[in-house]
Amino acid sequence: MSELISVAGLVATTPRHLVTQDGLPITSFRLASSQRRFDRSQNKWIDGETNWYTVTGFRQLAINASTSVSKGDRILVTGKLRVRDWDNGERAGTSVEIEAESIGHDLSWGSAVFTRTVLVRETETSDTDSAAIDEAVDNLSKEFLQEAELVGNKKK
């Protein structure tokens, strides 16, 4: 599945930034998104169930996100949805990932100052580049699944 979605949520882990041997910048983090509703009888906001996503950005987006996004930030993400089943022999579960096309701060929760970056002209994506991206996403997904218990995404 590769649907384009937009999600608002809270950055739940410190973003990881790396550059592959081929020079591909990658930034990845976990995003927690909860629906909220106002309960008039209690006169307070109630959090609904939390959905967890692994968000990964590449190239210039990865560079910009690594310097702009921090754990605890409220953000908006638009990208391609990927849902993958996994089994490591001891546990099994489902990983929900977003390959980000854009990331920005949610201005409902605060203000931001925008700084334009100089863009480097990108060449057309090659099959080798696509394979490197897929491999990097798989490796990052495995790392995040191992750490998922630390941010409340425990699989049973």
PLM regions: where:
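Conserved positions in beta-strands of structured domains
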Residues: 11-12, 16-18, 58, 82, ...
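A beta-strand/beta-hairpin structural motif
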Residues: 42-67
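Acidic, gly/ser/pro-rich intrinsically disordered tails
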Residues: 1, 19-22, 107-156
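Short, acidic/hydrophobic/Gly-rich beta-strand patch recurrent on exposed beta strands
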Residues: 28-32, 54-56, 98-99
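Beta-rich strand-turn-strand
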Residues: 58-92
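OB-fold and OB-like beta-barrel modules that bind single-stranded nucleic acids
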Residues: 5-12, 31, 71-82, 100
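Core FKBP-type peptidyl-prolyl cis-trans isomerase
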Residues: 5-47, 90-94
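OB-fold/S1-family single-stranded nucleic acid-binding modules
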Residues: 88-111
